[in-house]
């Protein structure tokens, strides 16, 4: 590191010293350490930042584990639900911009009190709203907080991770959103059938956030401004960083943070942020809508759609693989000291396996574990690109000004949420078969009164009865008229001359002839299943809409996956905006030169103070 690679701190000189405040204020709002922590403590602080990220995203994604239940419970259309997601993302986008102020104010308070606010909104707010508009308001408020935390948590991870361990650390941070989705799926799978309604999922996640708030209030720490706003490439830089921090002047503080957006709002950072946002369209589709996708497109061997629990089980496999792969590829990227090769291979592999994943929708009977294998490999390729990208992006920001990492992450958060929000505007245009499927699914899955089966199973198990009833609907409608039922029943029990005459008078000669003609079919296909067939007839319009929606849904989802594939393709050119090396050998040479520069500069500082 040369003498001009580190930049001074961002804490405002007008900011009062913590010593001027009482002990209660310091306990609640002052969470700084003034010496770079040892490896053990640093790992603990990183762990808390990751834990907070996991819990915050668990609460944010709670709705995705019970989306079909929410649509049914609030009588909400799929389009309305998507617009809630859009508004929440757009609010989060603009909330991320002022979150860049964490460069001056620190990260810890945003995270700690963000946990408290989100916990209360989720645990108390959602269970106590009774309509779709109330739900929309609460989720939008959660999006506001999430947008700020999207900036604060990776900034804190950067503060406690030198560049040589950055991809590993960012791999752990990106586990946060992924693990949040994983926990959502696992908890829903294990608990949803134990509780009366979907609100239980929000209560569980909200209480978890409040408990995590209490832990972070006691133990989460920020680096002091003078430490966090310098560039640290390796753990061996610690002595140099601390020596500089003690010698930073107020004028250097002001110069380092003058006009932050003018320093950060550059085409390479914007392009890189836009590229990864497009690449992650499939990630956000998975996080927000895979529960609906799996439960409306795929069916079991008996013809019934995958249940919400089965869909969450598939989600758990996807997110679990994603989480493990993020850590593995982050560590590998640090060991090889390169980012761009991982990003390029991950994007190409992601395109190939998203094509394969999309193709599975063509067969509604695709086996459950076949889907598991394909989605695990897809998740691995997404992680292969994303963890190194996060590390590379923070390093790009540090090259411009290490004192403005929070501002750089605010730019990324703004572009990410804005891109996702705008793209989702078109989701209901591409996918519009969800409403008839979700709205009418209960009619197909609930038990038919007086029987031990449901419409979906009956349609699958008794196609001959359904076909006969459909082809002779007008004839059977005459037989089922209330005034004709006793006559038909008497004729079936005793085909005497008197009963035949009564039937001829009630039904007419044409219908009586049909009774005689189809007496075998009536006895074997209709009479034993009269309750089931009457149920199908009474709900024919809704069940027909459901069947049409099921037929249309796979193609519509495949169209959206093509949009996601296009986003991945557009990401590839932005890989070249990253300033890192392609060759591990050249990267090792850069590190050797950096180590020599650090030793020389530290010697100069020590000599100057001697």
Predicted regions and their residues:
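C-terminal ends and interior cores of transmembrane alpha-helices
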Residues: 116-130, 348-365
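Cytoplasmic helix-loop-helix junction between adjacent transmembrane helices
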Residues: 138-176
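Cytoplasmic membrane-interface "Motif A"-like loop-to-helix N-cap segments
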Residues: 104-115, 334-348
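A late C-terminal transmembrane helix in Major Facilitator Superfamily
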Residues: 402-435
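Helix-loop-helix hairpin linking two adjacent transmembrane segments in secondary transporters
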Residues: 173-225
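Juxtamembrane intracellular "pre-TM" segments in multi-pass secondary transporters
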Residues: 19-39, 224-273
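Conserved MFS/SLC helix-loop-helix module at the cytosolic interface between two early adjacent transmembrane helices
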Residues: 94-130
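Extracytoplasmic gate region of multi-pass secondary transporters
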Residues: 63-65, 265-319, 386, 390, ...
């Amino acid at each position: 590191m040369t003498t001009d690679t580190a930049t001074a701190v961002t804490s405002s000189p007008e900011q009062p010293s913590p010593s001027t405040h009482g002990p209660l204020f310091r306990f609640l709002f002052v969470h700084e350490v003034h010496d770079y922590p040892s490896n053990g403590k640093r790992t603990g602080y990183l762990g808390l930042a990751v834990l907070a990220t996991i819990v915050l995203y668990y609460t944010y994604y709670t709705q995705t584990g019970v989306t079909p239940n929410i649509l049914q419970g609030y009588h909400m259309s799929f389009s309305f639900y998507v617009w809630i997601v859009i508004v929440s993302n757009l609010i989060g986008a603009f909330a991320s911009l002022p979150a860049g102020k964490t460069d001056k104010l620190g990260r810890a308070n945003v995270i700690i009190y963000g946990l408290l606010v989100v916990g209360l909104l989720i645990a108390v707010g959602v269970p106590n709203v009774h309509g779709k508009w109330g739900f929309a308001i609460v989720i939008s408020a959660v999006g506001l907080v999430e947008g700020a935390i999207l900036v604060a948590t990776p900034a804190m991870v950067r503060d406690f991770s030198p560049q040589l361990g950055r991809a590993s650390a960012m791999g752990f941070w990106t586990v946060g959103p992924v693990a949040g989705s994983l926990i959502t799926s696992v908890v829903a799978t294990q608990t949803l059938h134990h509780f009366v309604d979907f609100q239980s999922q929000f209560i569980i996640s909200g209480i978890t956030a409040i408990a995590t708030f209490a832990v972070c209030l006691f133990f989460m720490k920020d680096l002091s401004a003078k430490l966090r706003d310098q560039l640290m490439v390796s753990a061996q830089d610690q002595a140099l960083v601390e020596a500089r921090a003690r010698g930073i002047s107020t004028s250097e503080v002001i110069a380092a943070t003058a006009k932050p957006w003018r320093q950060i709002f550059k085409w390479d950072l914007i392009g890189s942020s836009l590229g990864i946002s497009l690449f992650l369209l499939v990630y956000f589709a998975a996080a927000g809508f895979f529960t609906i996708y799996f439960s409306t497109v795929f069916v079991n061997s008996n013809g019934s759609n995958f249940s919400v629990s089965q869909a969450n089980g598939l989600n758990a496999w996807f997110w679990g693989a994603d989480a493990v792969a993020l850590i593995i590829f982050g560590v590998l990227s640090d060991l090889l000291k390169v980012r761009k090769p991982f990003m390029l291979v991950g994007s190409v592999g992601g395109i190939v396996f998203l094509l394969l994943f999309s193709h599975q929708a063509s067969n509604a009977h695709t086996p459950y574990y076949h889907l598991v294998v394909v989605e695990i490999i897809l998740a691995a390729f997404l992680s292969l690109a994303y963890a190194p990208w996060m590390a590379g992006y923070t390093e790009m920001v540090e090259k411009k000004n290490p004192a403005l990492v929070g501002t750089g992450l605010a730019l990324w958060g703004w572009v990410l949420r804005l891109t996702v929000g705008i793209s989702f505007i078109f989701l209901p245009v591409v996918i519009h078969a969800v409403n008839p499927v979700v709205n009418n699914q209960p009619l197909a899955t609930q038990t038919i009164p007086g029987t031990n089966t449901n419409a979906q199973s009956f349609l699958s198990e008794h196609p001959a009865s359904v076909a006969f009833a459909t082809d002779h609907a007008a004839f059977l409608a005459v037989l089922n008229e209330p005034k004709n039922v006793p006559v038909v029943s008497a004729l079936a029990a005793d085909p005497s001359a008197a009963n035949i005459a009564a039937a001829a008078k009630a039904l007419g000669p044409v219908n009586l002839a049909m009774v005689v003609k189809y007496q075998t079919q009536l006895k074997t296909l209709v009479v034993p299943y009269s309750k089931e067939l009457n149920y199908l007839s009474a709900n024919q319009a809704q069940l027909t809409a459901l069947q049409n929606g099921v037929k249309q849904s796979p193609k519509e989802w495949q169209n959206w996956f093509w949009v996601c594939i296009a986003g991945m393709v557009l990401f590839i050119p932005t890989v070249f905006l990253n300033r890192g090396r392609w060759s591990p050998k050249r990267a090792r040479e850069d590190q050797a030169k950096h180590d020599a520069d650090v030793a020389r500069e530290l010697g100069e500082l020590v000599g100057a103070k001697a």
